[in-house]
Amino acid sequence: MDDCAMMASNIKYHRGNKQILDVENFCVNKGETVALIGINGSGKSTLVQVMALLLKPDEGSLFFHGQEITPQKMLHFRRRMALVFQESLLLDTTVYNNVASGLRLRGHKKSEIDARVMDWLKKFGVESLASSSTRFLSGGEAHRVSLARALVMDPEVLFLDEPFAALDFPTKKALISEFSDILKATKISTVFVTHDPHEIPVMANKVTVLEAGKVIQSSTTQDLFAHPVNDYVAFMANAIK
């Protein structure tokens, strides 16, 4: 547990009588980027939402840097995470206001907000759009703003639920490359759900395969290719090659 930025232990989650998650152990190491893969309905997005404290598990425990996340401390830990969905979900205001919104809610000084917002807009190459309305952004621009809005909060753990899925291939390829460089520089512990095999070699240090809500294998991409534990994992690994 010492190396885990976040860990899910013996997590069970049901919808009605159907068990969606049965995760014995899932650890995201400090500074690691983990890709969650599996067929539709395998529990990837649900696991992310449980770990991001959006869904309450029926059983099990979550740990953040070794500390158990209790109901009393949930808000404290939630402030140290960020979550980005497939849709950018931007506010109908300027790019600057979107990225600044979380910092304002936490009471940061205007000078600090200005510096942090413009720094992240520059990192994503959209600083010239700071005063633009989000209504007029392209898909790629909107996703860059959405990622900047998450990262400006300086999260220790970042969750991504197919954030690039809606983009065309050239835009997606460029953004994944840029974002991968940012993750390597910041060393933010990251979990991302993907159905796109092209994202994994560029972004991930580790791949975790889910089937029917269970973690079947969690290893480096190379180990996944060389030593799949069963035919299902071999099938998923072949999709990445």
Predicted regions and their residues:
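Conserved ABC transporter NBD signature motif
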Residues: G60-E68, F77
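Helix-to-loop junction immediately C-terminal to a conserved catalytic motif
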Residues: A52
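Catalytic Walker B motif of ABC-type/P-loop ATPase nucleotide-binding domains
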Residues: L158-E162
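Conserved ABC ATPase "signature" C-loop
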Residues: A212-G213
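Conserved ABC ATPase "signature" region
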Residues: R104, S111-L129, D181
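Conserved ABC ATPase signature
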Residues: S133-L137, E141
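ABC ATPase "signature
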Residues: S218-S219, H227
